[in-house]
Regions:
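A short beta-strand motif characteristic of beta-propeller blades
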Residues: 4-10, 47-53, 86-99, 141-148, ...
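Beta-rich, blade/repeat-based domains predominating
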Residues: 11-26, 54-73, 96-116, 146-164, ...
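Conserved beta-strand positions in repeat-built beta-propeller and related beta-rich domains
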Residues: 22-24, 29-35, 69-75, 119-127, ...
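Short loop/turn segments that connect beta-strands within beta-propeller blades
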Residues: 43-47, 81-85, 137-141, 179-184, ...
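Asp-box/WD-like beta-propeller blade repeats and closely related beta-sheet repeat scaffolds
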Residues: 83-123, 127, 140-142
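Loop/turn-rich, solvent-exposed surfaces of beta-rich toroidal or solenoidal domains
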Residues: 174, 193-231
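Blade-level signature of beta-propeller repeat domains, shared across WD40, Kelch, NHL, RCC1
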Residues: 247-297
Length: 297
């Protein structure tokens, strides 16, 4: 079965990432443009668009229960109120006990169903394994380093019964699964092996049946995988190379929002071959997804 896609938002993003869907009927779709230093949004129902600038590159945006966002700015994370006021939060240095050896930034992040924020880091020179995965407590006061030796910390999500966490370190070329218990991770193993030619696994979300929907950088698609067996079950092709992440949206959570990118700074930008690079897309893969979890602090 061919799953068609259409453009949802044609504002071009240098590096669109981390979409979420909140509000009435899960219609407030929001994402970040990491190197454009922008948080952008569009309403699925009304079509209303908004955006605001950040002072630094912003690796993720996570909506809060009381309004505003948690932003993965280069020196953050920071808590942003609805009026734009910023509040400092625990930093990597607080969690690690030492400063970054090289220049790192935050990348993907997601709130677990039990309220913790999991957030990962990566080096700008992303071939090095200097990144790590962290957990921020639901009150926003304690940042804990869970493990290091990460190249590009990327997509994550949880099983319905909250006993498993799925995780992507892009250059590991796999989708891994952990046993999950109240914010603690153990027993890491590979669920999906990514073959040469498929592209690089990037952001990810899961549906109500615990199937995984993985965006592929340099792969021009989102692929669906069975969350129990790792078998590929679907592919959504896009007219761009660099597909970055996805989330479910809409009243029935049956619309898949897909972010894409022009590329990283310094990379050649060929908009002749891929004129829609950096656009946001929407598809209906025929499944029901999960709601975006909000952060409590």
């Amino acid at each position: 079965m061919t799953i068609s896609v259409e453009v949802f938002d044609s504002r071009r993003n240098q590096l669109g990432e981390g979409p979420t869907a909140t509000g009435d009927k899960n219609s407030h779709v929001q994402w970040c443009d990491i190197y454009g230093q922008l948080i952008r949004s569009k309403n699925l129902i009304t079509g209303e668009i908004n955006e605001y600038k950040t002072d630094e590159p912003v690796g993720f945006q996570v909506p809060r229960k009381n309004g505003g966002d948690i932003l993965g700015t280069a020196n953050g994370p920071v808590l942003r109120d609805k009026d734009g006021t910023l509040h400092k939060m625990p930093s990597r240095e607080d969690a690690d006990g030492f400063k970054d050896k090289n220049v790192l930034r935050w990348n993907d992040a997601k709130v677990s169903p039990d309220g913790n924020l999991f957030l990962g880091s990566m080096a700008y020179e992303n071939q090095t394994n200097e990144g790590a995965l962290y957990r921020l407590s639901s009150d926003g006061k304690a940042l804990t380093r869970l493990f290091g030796d990460v190249a590009i910390s990327n997509g994550m999500d949880w099983s319905n019964d909250l006993t498993k966490m799925f995780y992507i370190d892009t250059f590991a070329m796999s989708v891994d699964v952990f046993d999950y218990d109240a914010g603690k991770l153990s027993n890491r193993r590979k669920l999906v092996e990514i073959s040469d030619g498929m592209g690089y696994p990037d952001g990810m979300c899961s549906d109500s049946q615990d199937n995984l929907w993985v965006a592929f950088w340099m792969g021009s698609c989102v692929r669906g995988f069975d969350g129990k067996t790792g078998k590929q079950i679907a592919e959504i092709k896009l007219p761009v190379q660099k597909v970055t992440s996805c989330c479910f949206a809409g009243e029935k959570l049956d619309q898949l929002i897909i972010t894409t990118a022009v590329g990283n700074p310094g990379e050649p930008m060929d908009l002749t071959e891929y004129p829609e690079a950096g656009f946001i897309y929407v598809a209906q893969p025929g499944v029901v997804g999960k709601k975006t979890n909000l952060f409590g602090a």
